């Protein structure tokens, strides 16, 4: 990329690209990442309480059935899937407004919506089970709507704040907070259910059908678990409101290079030339809309690649997470439903979810953070899809054998989670935040993420039907279908180029170059990309102290 003093890019953007990692970046990761912590907690805690909802609201008094009450297939799919529908719509709406109004202006709205609807979910009361479940679904939809907005905004903000050498790690670190949220969903559910178990002893379902429901204590438990999701969102809101607009949006979209330079001088201890004349030429070369032949020529294949891979990944990833409760009995991690009471079953499901997340899900996210700017996004995504496909195929074919060999089953199951997160679950989030021009970056990330949530909806309303009630033949079929899905993701990855080590303007072609290259080409490697010591040893520095951060946040 050209130098700032005579090249095609703006000095303020070059300064961001070559700035050393400082406290500014760390604070931004935490602020954006806490949104993803909340997202994951809110989306995945429903899996730990859905069986409890079935016992409480779908088991009539005086029941003589051999098994406790369970949500109907329709109710189960709605309770779990409605938040995903809301997420898809929220991604598209907030992604669009993130480009039209600014990243910062709509960023805090997502947290307020998440906090309010998490509380509303726990306060879902009604005179009948239909009223309770219907009210819960209403709040879960709008909770998902807020969660959806966090995807394109957090990814875009982090990519536009980052330097080019460690941009992948920064964006991946924001997304890795999803892993922490999944762990806490299991941990909080486990703690709350265990506290209520201590003071509310009850026989198993076999011992006494009615007493095993543990009413009214059990009715408080699921409500508390859902409402706890509001606290991290509220705790982060103040800091989000203090974040400055990204320099890239201010300069390129608002057309105010002087303001962008002034903002960054409060964050970077340097003098930056405003370059208003260069900005006019810069914008003239990039003033094409999303729905244009120019965009299709430059980025059409890239958008197809990011949408298809995220769609296919989320079919597998959400199937894994949302159907855990149905697969755990086959792995020997939880007792049969009739052998335990309501809160003991919830505790066992939560404990199993926590262990799988801690040992399989969580490490994969952070291995990606460590290696994404060394191996590249492209290779990590290929490896992840391939390994997920192989492990799921093995589990599907050997399912009957694995049911009696719990350790091996658990190991294979955990490895699929590891390679999902050290793989496409992380990279499909990172790549759309880097590939597309500033003018449509948030929208394109939103379209890609919405395609992913469409895959999650397929998982919730389709794959879940196969695993419902832990039927052996159906689970085997589901695992083989997911193996094929992952292999398709492997092949569609060839449409997505490598972005490692280059500036956002170079990747998107905004600096006058041709952009990221054709689909399937690891463009960074082909272009001889690398970051020299001089790129990161310049005098531009982010503030090291929290005082300087506070100053920059008020800019």
Swiss-Prot record:
One GO molecular-function entry: phosphate transmembrane transporter activity
PANTHER family documented for this protein: SOLUTE CARRIER FAMILY 22 MEMBER (PTHR24064)
Pfam families referenced in this protein's UniProt entry, alphabetically: Sugar_tr
Additional information: Although related to the sugar transporter family, it does not transport sugars.
Transmembrane segments: 29-49, 78-98, 106-126, 131-151, 168-188, 217-237, 299-319, 352-372, 378-398, 409-436, 443-463, 478-498
GO terms, biological process: phosphate ion transport
Keyword Transmembrane helix part of the UniProt annotation: yes
Protein known as: Inorganic phosphate transporter 1-11
């Amino acid at each position: 990329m050209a130098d700032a003093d005579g090249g095609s890019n703006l000095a303020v953007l070059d300064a961001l690209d070559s700035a050393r990692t400082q406290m500014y970046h760390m604070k931004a990761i935490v602020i954006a990442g806490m949104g993803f912590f909340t997202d994951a907690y809110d989306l995945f805690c429903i899996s730990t309480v859905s069986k409890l909802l079935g016992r409480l609201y779908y088991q009539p008094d005086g029941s003589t059935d051999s098994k406790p009450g369970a949500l109907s297939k329709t109710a189960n799919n709605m309770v779990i899937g409605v938040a995903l529908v809301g997420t898809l719509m929220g991604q598209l709406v907030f992604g669009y407004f993130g480009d039209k109004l600014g990243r910062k202006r709509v960023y805090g709205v997502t947290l307020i919506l998440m906090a309010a609807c998490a509380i509303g979910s726990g306060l879902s009361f009604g005179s009948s089970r239909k009223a309770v479940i219907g009210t819960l679904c209403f709040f879960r939809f709008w909770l998902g709507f807020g969660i959806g907005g966090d995807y394109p905004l957090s990814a875009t903000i982090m990519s536009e704040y980052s330097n080019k050498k460690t941009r992948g790690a920064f964006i991946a670190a924001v997304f890795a907070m999803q892993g922490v949220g999944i762990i806490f969903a299991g941990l909080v559910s486990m703690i709350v259910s265990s506290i209520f178990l201590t003071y509310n002893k009850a026989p198993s379902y076999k011992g006494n059908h009615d007493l095993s429901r543990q009413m009214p204590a059990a009715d408080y438990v699921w409500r508390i678990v859902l409402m706890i999701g509001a606290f991290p969102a509220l705790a982060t809101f103040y800091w989000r409101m203090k974040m400055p607009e990204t320099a890239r949006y201010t300069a390129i979209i608002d057309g105010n290079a002087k303001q962008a330079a002034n903002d960054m001088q409060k964050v970077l201890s340097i003098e930056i030339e405003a370059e208003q004349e260069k900005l006019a030429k810069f914008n003239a070369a990039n003033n094409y809309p999303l729905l244009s032949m120019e965009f299709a020529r430059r980025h059409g294949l890239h958008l197809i690649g990011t949408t298809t891979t995220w769609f296919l990944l989320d079919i597998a990833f959400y199937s894994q997470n949302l159907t855990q409760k149905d697969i755990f009995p086959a792995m020997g991690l939880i007792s049969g439903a009739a052998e335990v009471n309501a809160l003991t079953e919830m505790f066992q499901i939560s404990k199993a979810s926590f262990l799988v997340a801690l040992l399989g899900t969580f490490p994969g996210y952070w291995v990606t953070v460590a290696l994404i700017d060394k191996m590249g996004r492209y290779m990590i995504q290929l490896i992840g899809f391939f390994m997920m496909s192989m492990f799921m195929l093995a589990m599907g074919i050997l399912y009957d054998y694995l049911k009696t060999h719990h350790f091996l089953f658990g190991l294979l199951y955990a490895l699929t989670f590891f390679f999902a997160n050290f793989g496409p679950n992380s990279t499909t989030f990172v790549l759309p935040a880097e590939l597309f021009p500033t003018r449509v970056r948030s929208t394109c990330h939103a379209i890609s993420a919405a395609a992913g949530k469409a895959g999650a909806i397929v998982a919730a309303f389709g794959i879940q039907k196969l695993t419902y009630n832990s039927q052996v033949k159906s689970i085997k079929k589901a695992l083989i279908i997911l193996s094929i899905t992952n292999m398709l993701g492997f092949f569609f990855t060839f449409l997505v180029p490598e972005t490692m080590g280059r500036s956002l303007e170079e990747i998107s072609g905004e600096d006058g170059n041709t952009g990221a290259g054709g689909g399937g080409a690891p463009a960074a490697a082909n272009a001889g990309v690398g970051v020299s010591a001089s790129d990161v040893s310049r005098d531009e520095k982010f503030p090291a102290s929290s005082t300087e951060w506070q100053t920059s946040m008020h800019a």
